[in-house]
Amino acid sequence: MLALLAAALLPERDPRGHKGTFGRVLVVAGSLDYVGAALMSGAAAVRAGSGLVTLCVPASLQPVVAGRVPELISRGLPEETAYEIDAPAAAAEIAELPADALLVGPGLRPGRGTTAVVQK
């Protein structure tokens, strides 16, 4: 019953559509201790119906997340220290990426770099 109600609320997908047609989500997430949070957030965006999901993690974690969820595009962000993003460089890269929605935070370590990226 709930599944039928949910399906009725969702718009019909254009059969001629492509990944870009169904929305682009940018997820900025993850740290050494919380790689799973980044992966689960990206997978949730895919499962929710997003057409194109880019998962941005600290550069040293990019090889760890690449290919774990095949539907995700993974991208490494510049780091200030191991596993912590360099705020100015990361914010500049994030600003260049196309997105209809932005999710920032799951699994990011609290710190100056994280706070600065969120503020920018």
Language-model features, listed with the residues they occupy:
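Small-residue (G/A/S/T)-rich helix-start motifs and N-terminal tracts that mark the onset
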Residues: 1-120
